[in-house]
Curated annotation (Swiss-Prot):
Stored InterPro entries: Uncharacterised_YpbF_TM
Regions crossing the membrane: 42-62, 64-84
Organism, scientific name: Bacillus subtilis (strain 168)
Lineage of source species: Bacteria, Bacillati, Bacillota, Bacilli, Bacillales
Keyword Transmembrane: yes
Any single GO CC term annotated in Swiss-Prot or TrEMBL for this entry: plasma membrane
Protein name stated in the entry: Uncharacterized protein YpbF
Length: 147
C-alpha cells in the first residue's frame, strides 16, 4: 500500500496526498462500523430467536408464558443478552452514520476542490489516473458528489 502512495507523488502534491490518505482512512473506519453494526444486529436477532424458541418449547400452556419467564433466571439472562446486543448494534449504527457523514463531506470537498488541487493542465490529466486508482483500489468515487 505504501508503494501505491509513493506512486501518487508524480500525480499529486503532499497536501493532496494527505487528503486522499485521510479519505481512505475514513472509508475504512466507515466500513468497520458498518460491519460491527451488522454483526451485532445478527447477534440480537439470534438471541431473540433462541429466546422465543426456548420459551415455546418449555412453556406448557400459552397462558403461563409470563409466569415461566419470570420464574427462571435463564430467560432473564437471555432477555438481557438480547437487549445488550440490540443496544450495541444501535450504538454502532450511530457511529456508522457519523463516520459516513464525515467520509462523504471529505469526499465532496476533494471533488469540489479538484480544480485547486490539480491546477496545471498536465496535472489535470493526471487527476484522472488518481480518480481511477481510488475507484478501483478503494471503491471511492471521486467523479460525482452523489452517494
Amino acid at each position: 500500500m505504501e508503494s501505491l502512495w509513493n506512486q501518487l507523488d508524480q500525480f499529486t502534491d503532499a497536501p493532496t496526498k494527505q487528503m486522499l490518505q485521510a479519505l481512505v482512512k475514513r472509508k475504512q473506519k466507515f466500513e468497520n462500523y458498518a460491519a460491527q453494526c451488522r454483526r451485532w444486529r445478527w447477534a440480537s436477532l439470534i438471541c431473540l430467536g433462541l429466546l422465543c424458541v426456548m420459551i415455546m418449547i418449555k412453556s406448557p400452556e400459552p397462558q403461563l408464558i409470563l409466569q415461566e419467564i419470570l420464574s427462571h433466571t435463564f430467560y432473564l439472562f437471555w432477555m438481557l443478552a438480547t437487549a445488550f446486543a440490540y443496544c450495541t448494534s444501535y450504538y454502532f449504527k450511530k457511529k456508522e452514520e457519523k463516520s459516513e457523514t464525515d467520509f462523504h463531506k471529505l469526499r465532496c470537498e476533494i471533488i469540489q476542490k479538484s480544480t485547486d488541487l490539480w491546477p496545471q493542465p498536465d496535472k489535470w490529466k493526471a487527476r484522472e489516473s488518481v480518480f481511477h486508482m481510488m475507484k478501483h483500489k478503494y471503491d471511492i468515487n471521486l467523479y460525482f458528489e452523489s452517494k
